[in-house]
């Protein structure tokens, strides 16, 4: 009598990022090599609550996915899975319903691809007995427990390319160009892109800034014969003594335009503001992100084969390892104000708006 085919599930949750499809592809191809069946769950964790919200994924379904942005499974960062208010097990509890759905589908593992919010939900499901394995995703690179998340490198490439393009127009018109990039709570994109693109000022959430110091940097460049400036600001950056800025409830944004308006008043120079926004999320993943996503997907299946649950695959140095999901939850991977990268930037004359 033939044994029942092993089955695993995979879902994508939270904001989209380049490399999601590459992870899905690696999961399907690796599982297929073991003779396993893969169930793709639509619309993140919400798909565990619906009917007919999943489908079998075959090698044919993932053909050509490696360079494709977005996610064929769709995703959502809203829904029923908020923080659990009670340890009581109720049939109305979405977490309880999700665990039941996992059991009914006969999944030996559920691979959850996402950032801190996704892994927090996965951890709660694991506490209720679900065999979950996390895969770290966020363009902000702010997920704890791993040295690098996929999606970051592609976003960095987009931001750096934007700085390169802004340099030519800024120099041609003697303008100050302000580029607002993503980074709700951390400044990894702004810092890396600012260094790679040769910015003059970098403003990040970890280093509150004085707009007067930023203006002084712009005017100092003028006096030195450089009549244009490039300023890169993370969306979560904030002035010293101030708070983050929002363009709508729960949506960070507006800091770039605020910086631009203040600099026009303080320097009398012409300022233009560019907000990259979702351009950083879309499009084909970079070669590095394709490789990292592929390694993560394959490692997640290997973890399932070894019966390792309640863990997240992660990059440590050059190796892919597994770490407890709890390591990815509760705190963020932030830029250290005295890190080598920040010190490097300062040594090059890049200002952070906190100078004395």
Curated annotation (Swiss-Prot):
Its EC number is 2.7.1.11. The active site is at 140 (proton acceptor). It comes from the Bacteria. Its cofactor is Mg(2+). One of its GO terms (molecular function) is metal ion binding. Mg(2+) binds at residue 116. PANTHER family: ATP-DEPENDENT 6-PHOSPHOFRUCTOKINASE 3, PHOSPHOFRUCTOKINASE. Homodimer or homotetramer. This is ATP-dependent 6-phosphofructokinase. It comes from Chloroflexus aurantiacus (strain ATCC 29364 / DSM 637 / Y-400-fl).
